[in-house]
Amino acid sequence: FLKMALRICGDYGYGYRMYTSADKRVCPKGTPYFLLKASTLLSRLWGKRYGVPMPDYLLFPDWSVPGMRDSYEAYKKHILTIWGNLPEGITETFVHPAVESDELKGITNAWQCRVWEYQLLKDPEMHQYLKDHGVELISYRELVKMKAKK
């Protein structure tokens, strides 16, 4: 499936949500590191073959970290610590931001996490923290342009 998806993305000039580099700091919890490295090798190989821009790393916030679900401030502190120690390159943070609603509460038990992810993206302190650490927020359109220059 990955190879076919990357070929189609290459045909249309789209980026793809996969990663091209492995780093233990951004290995999803429960994923053996060797599996991360193997998938990285395939995505890098096929992405290069078909000219598909992808982030270097894909970061999955781990909501099972003790204390992370206690409060928005605890969540924010944990995420900002991670973002302050990212590997060099382009990292996509995989989040599901959402506005609090009865519908959201009815479709997922993780509704509070999603609301906090939304709050974090609007938080001026977060924006200042990223600026202070040289982290720039970009879109996939900008990713495609950046990777095309390389």
Segments predicted by a language model, with ranges:
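Terminal accessory/targeting
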Residues: 3-150
